[in-house]
Amino acid sequence: MERDTSPLLFTFALAPERAYPADDTLPDRRFRMYDPARRQPVDWGTLGNLGSAARPLLYETLPRLGFDAGVHAFDLYKLYPDDLRFYRNGRSFSEVYFSQGRTQLDGMLDARFARTFAGGANFSLDYRSINNLGAYRYQRDKHNALSFGIWLPVGSRYDGFVIFSKNVIRQQENGGIVTDTIFGKEQFSGPISAEVRLPAQAALTRLADQTLQLTQHLKFAGGSGEGKRVLRATHTIAWMKADYKFADASLAQDSFFFDTFLTDRRGIRHFLSFNRLDNSFIISTFKAKTRGRPSDVLSVGLRHSFLDLNQEPRDSSFSNLFLTGNMTITPSDGFALVAQGNLGLLSNFGEYRISGELDIGFGKVGRLRAGILSQRYPPSLLFYRLFVSKRLMWQNDFAKSLENSLYATYALPLIGLEMTARTHLINNYLYYNQKGVAVQTASPLQIAQFIISENIGLGPFRFENTVALQQSNRSDVLRLPHWFTKNSLYFSGKLFKKRLQLDAGVDFRMNSEFRPDAYQPVTWQFHLQDSLTQKPYPWIDLFAAFKVQSFRFFVRYENMSTIWNKTEATYQTARYPQPFGAIRFGIAWRFMDSNEKGAGTPPASEPPPNSGTGIGPKGRG
């Protein structure tokens, strides 16, 4: 299969010295898998609706540093300043992705735009929108995420980035369905007829945040030329305001659902907000043998955060302070070593996060990657303290968690093989029990994982496979599938005098029997439950995806199993069934236009075409 060779590179505000190649425009799995939860290497579990609360089904370590509110169920759908790509080219760039399901209220839109102006100034914008009514009563998800910024280089020594981002998450909360025993019966007229556990249809989640960030880089020594050592100072200041709210003002029919959290029969409300001001100052030195790919980076700095917290009805303010360090050695495509460290000071004494990654290429023999992450961090806010309707539900004195993760990956691109072994060890693990209450384990939690991917090509046919295995020593506190498989079998070839690229076939996924977590909308948390067990369920999608130049189109019929089995539902979250079979389509196109004469001067740190490496941060969605 031919690759898209457009010389399109991008960088990030915190490290403009390093460039990365942009995604291609092939009609591949990432294109046709429109749902962010299914774009992950192993699918995340959701509430069955596009844009709904989600969590990993293969355990993942969440990097932590200082204060954390503990609200992460919607992270897949958000945009933040650190994620904004600035495209390093002399042409205007725009890309749009749109997908729609059965109705006009089942759609999503992703859009990117970038332009370089005279003098090297660069503007970049990302926008995401999800508006999905859902198949069941009162489960609509409506999200908007926006991030835009300006990159302003002055001469060869200064780079300034101003970025603004805003996320608004809205989810109607129906509590899941009461029973699925009516599925397939004569009186069942479709998912909309299923009774839900919050029948008043008044419970609503709204999470909103906005961030304004200014990053400035000043080079004291060295310049933009190749092979010169640079000494640079970087200052970043970011202000963030966040408001998280759940409310249900109609408890006449909904009171039974809330159980532990029913503090006031007139209505339930959980509200918290905070203002956060982050300041970081970093001194770094690096040298680039090839522009856009520094061969070594060494940096040290301080990071301070001031937080003004309103956890209704209590107000508080406090600070976090960390010493930071980074070392990166990438002398060639065949070797990369990255080490990062963060050490807590003053009130954060005893907290830390240390990570390292080694990447070695052996040519045709393959590639080896290995990494480690060790961190000690305090409980997130909602593990520590919770108010519901201004009444204290809990205030815990939990110990700080200590987490160590280690992985090794061997890849042999020649035969499309990649194998990863990973282990996690967590002391003082925190979770939410069957009542949705915060709990801490007294004994360590250990998880072992093995993931293998094999992509096979036989003429025009492709067979792509990912199989993941995981096992923990504490099935009483962590309940995830022991195995997961996702596979694609399809035809891939060019038609109509090689003008049209066609991929057509089936996507398949299945996981082992497990007890999926329940979801508590009051706290926006997944928690243990004992009432439902999900057995292996064959999820089959039929698809066709096309590409003509930079225009792409897909159509797919999802969950074909419901064509012949109308009585069985599958769950990734207890009482929230995945949708029945339905058709979905999507389109995407990319434009690259030359700017006006005199407007194509790239920023001073612009790398030449074909520089950059695939090692490093990538977009999330």
Across the structure, where does each feature detected by a protein language model lie?
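Transmembrane beta-barrel wall of Gram-negative outer-membrane proteins
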Residues: 107-129, 138-170
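Exposed, low-structure sequence patches enriched in small/polar residues
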Residues: 89-91, 96, 206-251, 263-621
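Short strand-turn segments of transmembrane beta-barrel domains in outer membranes
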Residues: 67-69, 81-86, 90-112, 134
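Flexible loop and strand-edge segments within Gram-negative outer membrane beta-barrel domains
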Residues: 159-217, 244-252, 272, 375-377
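An acidic- and aromatic-residue-enriched active-site/binding cleft used to recognize and process polar
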Residues: 101, 118, 126-132, 155, ...
